[in-house]
Amino acid sequence: MNDQRKGDHAEPTTHFGYQDVPESQKAKKVAEVFHSVAAKYDLMNDVLSGGMHRLWKRFTIELSGVRAGNRVLDIAGGTGDLAAKFSRLVGPTGQVVLADINESMLKVGRDRLLDRGVAGNIEFVQADAEKLPFPDNHFDCVTIAFGLRNVTHKDEAIRSMLRVLKPGGR
């Protein structure tokens, strides 16, 4: 939060791309962007990152320490790339929750994983990273990949993630 005030009653601002916007408007602006690109998000990611996002995701999986039977939360999981990989690691005795605040992204991810037949141990939940609707100490691993940049109150999101992460979790 930049907390730039233009007077005593001005609302705090936060970043959105290359501009500052009132905090109350950021979630709406982010939602509009992701609703409009959901169907083409993976292609855009390939083009904009030169395919590097695939390496970053592989690196995330390798460092996660996730194994069979674990419970994983993938926040801002969108189209399900990480969730699919985690699903294979945790196996039938584990669980992956793909959470995304954006209904369009969540639908694309759910449809894609169902079409691939890898959604058997994946639950799809529309959720705000700042107010995760899960019990305390519930997950062995919590990831957010590129979604943290779109969260308005990053400190609240991190607190929420730590709350649902088991002691010793990653």
UniProtKB/Swiss-Prot annotation:
Gene3D superfamilies: Vaccinia Virus protein VP39. GO terms for molecular function: 2-methoxy-6-polyprenyl-1,4-benzoquinol methyltransferase activity; demethylmenaquinone methyltransferase activity. The keyword Membrane does not apply. It catalyses: a 2-demethylmenaquinol + S-adenosyl-L-methionine = a menaquinol + S-adenosyl-L-homocysteine + H(+); a 2-methoxy-6-(all-trans-polyprenyl)benzene-1,4-diol + S-adenosyl-L-methionine = a 5-methoxy-2-methyl-3-(all-trans-polyprenyl)benzene-1,4-diol + S-adenosyl-L-homocysteine + H(+). Keywords: Menaquinone biosynthesis, Methyltransferase, S-adenosyl-L-methionine, Transferase, Ubiquinone biosynthesis. Residues 1-12 have a biased composition (Basic and acidic residues). GO terms for biological process: menaquinone biosynthetic process; methylation. Pathway: Quinol/quinone metabolism; menaquinone biosynthesis; menaquinol from 1,4-dihydroxy-2-naphthoate: step 2/2; Cofactor biosynthesis; ubiquinone biosynthesis. Residues 1-22 are annotated as: Disordered. Its EC number is 2.1.1.163, 2.1.1.201. InterPro entries: SAM-dependent_MTases_sf, UbiE/COQ5_MeTrFase, UbiE/COQ5_MeTrFase_CS. CDD domains: AdoMet_MTases (cd02440). Methyltransferase required for the conversion of demethylmenaquinol (DMKH2) to menaquinol (MKH2) and the conversion of 2-polyprenyl-6-methoxy-1,4-benzoquinol (DDMQH2) to 2-polyprenyl-3-methyl-6-methoxy-1,4-benzoquinol (DMQH2). Belongs to the class I-like SAM-binding methyltransferase superfamily. MenG/UbiE family. This is Ubiquinone/menaquinone biosynthesis C-methyltransferase UbiE. It comes from Ectopseudomonas oleovorans.
